Structure formats: structure tokens, C-alpha cells
Amino acid sequence: MNNQQSRGALGTSGATPDLPDATPGLSRNPVGGHVPVAGGLHSVGLAYARDLAAEAVQVFVANPRGWATPAGNPRQDEEFRAACAAESIPAYVHAPYLINFGSHTEATVEKSVESLRHSLRRGREIGALGVVVHTGSATGGRERSVALAQVREHLLPLLDELTHDDDPYLLLESTAGQGASLCSRTWDFGPYFEALDAHPKLGVCLDTCHIFAAGHDLTGPSGMHQTLDLLVDTVGEGRLKLIHANDSKDVVGAHKDRHENIGSGHIGEDPFRALMTHPATEGVPLIIETPGGKEGHAADVEQLKKLRDG
């Protein structure tokens, strides 16, 4: 696939794609954003995406800072799924932030199981290709190995429940390295994947701000490519399924999760251009989670497209 094979953004016509794994017929890297859905997954979320000229979308299906597991609106679900399919728009779900399978608190772990199961089920209902979940931390002063054993105990059964052809992938997103994080550097994905038997429905969502804040310097002529090489060496080819394209307000290794608009932070534009030339990112969508509201989001989507196509 090359840039000349790109299809249009939301609001243009296109062929219905096969949804399971790849995004056939799309540009090398579809660029889109996380969109608000309060008031309607289709009527509000996709309307916002159209205003961004988004080629990919990410949504919440529950309050990201709570444990509620609301049922979807069947009409909105079907309209969203149909529009994404008809217009070749890959969609993703971001699971709630409170989920932590490494917690020392039994209630938190139990709620994490139900919350993620809900996100995975809702992901299938709306035709999402993947559900993003943060990798969590080892709370209560426990060893990382103990927390990872607990991750295995509770998360592996959820992966084994993904038996339908249209079930989404579970995409692990590393953190900026705050506290007792279970996964922040590229090599931390290794023990996490081992704990989950490198399950076939397991993938990675790479957040550029997080990995930069954790200590991977993405700047310079080869910083981004070296980081992606390390990731592939750790988890294998084909596991990178989604990229959260965010600049960073803070310097490399600051362990602060503060996103900035593309080119306005300490990462800068060039690493994002390099990102979209590495073999591991072929066909992988980019989702922005940057400041500035709709105007800022639209500018970031446009900027990433220019870096991709220029």
C-alpha cells in the first residue's frame, strides 16, 4: 500500500472493507482522533470526526473515570458501525482509565475485569478493530512479578473469551513511567506478553508522548526508528496495531503524561514523519489525543497528513 491508494476521510464514499485485522484500501497511515460521543455515538461522534477530516476514530463507550458499564444505543451502534464500514474508517475503543489488573485491592481488580469485559463487548457491537487499555501498575509495594502473575490470572481469561471473528484486539498501552508502572519502556512489553502467553488477540498501542516521557528519545535522525526496532524485537512483527500520536509538553524521561499539539512540544515534527516510514507502522492508524478542542484537533490531523503525504 502507498499514499496514492489513500481513500477519503469521513463524509466521502468508499468500499466496505474487511474489518478483522488489517485496513485494506486505506492510506499507509490513516490519521484521525479521539472524538466525543456524549449525545450519540454516530450523531455526535462521527459528526465531530467529519469536522476533523478524520480517517480513523477512537471513542469511549463508558465514563473513562468511572466503573459504570452502560448499555449501548442499538440504533446509534448500527449507524456508527455501518458508516465506518461504508466509508472505510477504522474505529477503536479506549477502555476506562481506572482499570488496573496489577492492583493490590481485590475490589479494583474485580471491577477492572467487568469494565474491560464491557469495553470488549461494546467494541464488537460497534465494529471496533481494537480496545486500548493501560497496562497498569504494581500497587501496594508489591514486586512486579507478583503483579504480572495477577495480570495473567485475570486478563488471560478475558482474551480467551474473544472467540468471534469480529472480536476486537486487546491493545496494551504503556504509561509514561510514573510510580510502579508495569510497562513503560519498549522492553517492558516482553514480560507482559509472556504473562499473557503472547495471545493471538493481543496487540500494542504505542503512545508517542508516553514512550518519550518514559525515556525513549524519539528525536534525532534515528530516534524514532530505533525505538520502533526495539518494540518489534520485543513483541514481534505485526503486534503494533494502533499509534496514539501526541507530542510532549515535557522533556524526554520526565515521566509526565502531558500531551502537546503535533510539532509544538519536545518531540517535534520530524519524528512523526519518521514514524510513518518505518516498516512496523505500515497500515497502522494514528489517533491524536492532543489539546485545543476541535480547532486544535483538526490542525493536528491536517499536520500529520502533510507529514505523511509530503
From Swiss-Prot:
A GO MF term: DNA-(apurinic or apyrimidinic site) endonuclease activity
Catalytic activity: Endonucleolytic cleavage to 5'-phosphooligonucleotide end-products
Ranges for region Disordered: 1-31
Residues that, per the record, bind Zn(2+) 2: 173, 207, 244, 289
List of residues binding Zn(2+) 1: 94, 134, 173
Cysteine pairings via disulfide bonds: none
Binding-site residues, Zn(2+) 3: 210, 257, 259
Keyword Metal-binding carried by entry: yes
Enzyme Commission (EC) number: 3.1.21.2
Record key words, sorted: DNA damage, DNA repair, Endonuclease, Hydrolase, Metal-binding, Nuclease, Zinc
Keyword Nuclease: yes
Cofactor(s) demanded: Zn(2+)
CC cofactor note: Binds 3 Zn(2+) ions.
CDD domains in the cross-refs: AP2Ec
Database matches in InterPro entries: AP_endonuc_2, AP_endonuc_F2_Zn_BS, Xyl_isomerase-like_sf, Xyl_isomerase-like_TIM-brl
BP GO terms, sorted: base-excision repair
Function: Endonuclease IV plays a role in DNA repair. It cleaves phosphodiester bonds at apurinic or apyrimidinic (AP) sites, generating a 3'-hydroxyl group and a 5'-terminal sugar phosphate.
Similarity comment: Belongs to the AP endonuclease 2 family.
NCBIfam families in alphabetical order: nfo (TIGR00587)
This protein's name: Probable endonuclease 4
Gene: nfo
